[in-house]
Curated annotation (Swiss-Prot):
Organism taxonomic ancestry: Bacteria, Bacillati, Bacillota, Bacilli, Bacillales
Protein name, entry field: Isopentenyl-diphosphate delta-isomerase
General function of this protein: Involved in the biosynthesis of isoprenoids. Catalyzes the 1,3-allylic rearrangement of the homoallylic substrate isopentenyl (IPP) to its allylic isomer, dimethylallyl diphosphate (DMAPP).
Source organism: Staphylococcus aureus (strain MSSA476)
Gene3D superfamilies: Aldolase class I
Keyword Zinc: no
UniProt keyword terms in alphabetical order: Cytoplasm, Flavoprotein, FMN, Isomerase, Isoprene biosynthesis, Magnesium, Metal-binding, NADP
């Protein structure tokens, strides 16, 4: 594939992603908090700091991986980096493979660090990238963490995608052992299982982003790029973010779990934190905001999102993220069926 074709693919991904819409109904709607009428705290008591063994984020919300690798996506990364700088959010760039192949593309990613020199930035590579390239991806952005995306359904629907996956787990293990910053194993919208969590724990992984279905749909994106558009029947493949978080429960004491995929509102973010996530990521909401409404409007959107999270936590009498994990939740029969059939051991306050 030529550099021009790769740039074109990056732009196509963004164009199709922006055209997608949020689900009107999701698994986040299949779980409810129990309301208690009189809180014992005030809004000013709320501490939204997200703390993991290696990373401290001012807020449990981050701009998740989306783009880079073309002139248009450079402009997007520049604007998102300004939003991150002005709001204190962490930010992940999209796959840096384009820059690792062609130094001319490096600036489409490094613009994020240029615009946000003191901020928290995650670099991003695929599970098949050589260890030396993973190290280069971290150095490229002076990144505080490295996302490794695992995206087999996307690759298999992508006309020019990868068809070989046998070496992925061993390669991830090699990267984890060599990279000096936290390595986050990140799905791309298909969710995670307890079996995967077991395998990742065995090779020393300490961070995952479950990225469940319900948000940006890369099966649909790649199917749109197919000549016959003949794989749309896989559109609903995978686990939702709620199901994925439940799948991680037994591993949350050893692995820091981030949640993304289909988060629409501050309430969805709070529900993710209540299910054990340490932070929540969003891609398309930020992309659409900054492209359609500009930087200032997106900054205001983030500030409002954070304030709404504080209001919800006040209603729940939760001073911090850890408190949220003790709050009472009622699940729908469908989610309870998933828990039962998957033999998940769920204990709640």
């Amino acid at each position: 594939m030529s550099d021009f074709q790769r740039e074109q693919r990056k732009n196509e991904h963004v164009e199709i992603a922006m055209a997608q819409s949020d689900a009107m109904y999701s698994d986040f709607d299949k779980m409810r908090f129990v309301h208690h009428s009189i809180p014992s705290i005030n809004v000013n008591d709320i501490d939204l700091t997200s703390q993991t063994p290696d990373l401290t984020m001012a807020y449990p919300v981050y701009i998740n991986a989306m783009t880079g690798g073309s002139e248009w996506t450079k402009n997007i990364n520049e604007k998102l980096a300004v939003v991150a700088r002005e709001t204190g959010l962490a930010m992940a760039v999209g796959s840096t493979h384009a820059a690792l192949r062609n130094p001319r593309m490096a600036e489409t990613f490094t613009i994020a660090r240029k615009m946000n020199p003191e901020g928290m930035i995650f670099s991003n590579v695929g599970a098949d990238v050589p260890v030396e390239k993973a190290l280069e991806a971290v150095e490229l952005l002076e990144a505080q963490a490295l996302q490794i995306h695992v995206n087999s359904p996307q690759e298999l629907v992508m006309p020019e995608g990868n068809r070989e996956f046998v070496t992925w787990l061993d390669n991830i293990a090699s990267i984890v052992s060599r990279v000096s910053v936290p390595v986050i194993i990140k799905e791309v919208g298909f969710g995670m299982s307890k079996e995967l969590m077991h395998d990742l724990q065995q090779i020393g992984v300490k961070y995952v982003d479950v990225s469940g279905k319900g948000g940006t749909n890369f099966v649909d994106i790649e199917n749109e790029r197919r000549a016959n558009k003949d794989m749309d029947y896989l559109s609903s493949w995978g686990q939702s973010t709620v199901e994925s978080l439940l799948e991680t429960t037994a591993y949350q004491s050893e692995i820091s779990v981030f949640a993304s995929g289909g988060l629409r509102t501050p309430l969805d973010a709070i529900k993710s934190l209540a299910l054990g996530a340490k932070a929540t990521g969003m891609s398309r909401p930020f992309l659409n905001q900054v492209e359609n409404n500009g930087i200032a409007h997106t900054v205001a959107y983030v500030e409002s999102f954070i304030e709404h999270m504080k209001s919800i936590m006040t209603m729940l009498d939760a001073k911090n993220i850890d408190d949220l994990t003790q709050k009472q939740i009622v699940f729908s029969p469908e989610i309870l069926s998933w828990i039962e059939q998957r033999s998940l051991n769920i204990h709640r306050g």
